[in-house]
């Protein structure tokens, strides 16, 4: 027998012996396919979200950029002002706000929107006593007494901001407003336009409801208008921001309600207190 044939015979013999001791391989089973409901990743159109079952964490999950509050994109935005009189598309006067019945008085007067009567984002006739960078969103957490029943669940910061039944947890909250290549920061000081109950939009994923102003979902002050270069009716993006995210700018200089002004006064008072003599006995 030739060497090649001997090698081949030995290989066949070894293969036969090993097959006697081999365990049969288990049959390969296909993994079970998960069953998905096509509606599982979105809300059913007929689903009604009641305040008890609603959890804001489902709606205000961090965006791709890691922000706690995602941007509301392409929102019709209109201009309003403190002291505004009723008109065809604005049936409610703005002498008072949802949270301040003496809004015009506390602001210091009529926030004249006429650009010819304004300079450096404020009226030329007086210096406002409140932040001229303000806005309105169509929700108020306050009821006639106390807060709306859904407020503790739908307002993401309700627990940390709660100061008792008479105080709004929404008033004064900072909002970033973006148009083009500009971003302006304003404080939430009123509820509107038109509605005060649309938490599904303000804190959720709904779009603004139809209204007399082309479905507007945000009102901004003349100062915000001028800083962004807005038209009377325009389109912007907006989102809530933590105060720590707000940079200094024209929105940080004025107002007894302004977080920057309040903090600066506290720092000044603390420094003045620290600079006082200790009052102890003088060592000679």
Predicted ranges, named:
Residues 23-284:
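Secreted/periplasmic proteins
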Residues 9-19:
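Bacterial N-terminal signal peptides
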Residues 2-7:
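Bacterial N-terminal signal peptides that target proteins for export
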């Amino acid at each position: 027998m030739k060497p090649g044939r001997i090698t081949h015979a030995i290989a066949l013999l070894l293969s036969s012996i090993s097959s006697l001791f081999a365990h049969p391989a288990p049959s390969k089973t296909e993994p079970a396919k998960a069953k998905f409901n096509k509606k599982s990743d979105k809300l059913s159109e007929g689903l009604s979200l009641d305040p008890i079952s609603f959890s804001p964490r489902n709606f205000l999950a961090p965006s791709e950029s890691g922000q706690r509050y995602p941007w509301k994109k392409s929102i019709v935005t209109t201009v309003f002002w403190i002291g505004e009189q009723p008109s065809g598309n604005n049936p409610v006067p703005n002498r008072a706000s949802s949270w301040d019945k003496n809004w015009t008085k506390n602001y210091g007067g009529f926030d004249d929107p006429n650009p010819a009567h304004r300079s450096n984002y404020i009226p030329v006739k007086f210096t406002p006593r409140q932040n001229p960078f303000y806005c309105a969103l169509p929700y108020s957490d306050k009821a006639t007494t106390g807060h709306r029943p859904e407020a503790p669940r739908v307002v993401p910061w309700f627990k940390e901001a709660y100061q008792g039944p008479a105080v709004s947890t929404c008033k004064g909250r900072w909002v970033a407003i973006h148009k083009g290549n500009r971003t302006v920061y304003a404080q939430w000081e009123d509820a509107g336009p038109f509605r005060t109950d649309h938490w599904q939009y303000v804190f959720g994923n709904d779009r603004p409801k139809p209204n007399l102003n082309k479905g507007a979902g945000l009102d901004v002050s003349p100062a915000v208008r001028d800083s962004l270069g807005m038209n009377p009716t325009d389109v912007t993006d907006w989102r809530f921001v933590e105060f720590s995210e707000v940079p200094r700018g024209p929105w940080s200089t004025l107002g007894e309600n302004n977080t920057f002004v309040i903090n600066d006064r506290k720092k000044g008072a603390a420094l003045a207190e620290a600079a006082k003599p200790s009052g102890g006995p003088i060592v000679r």
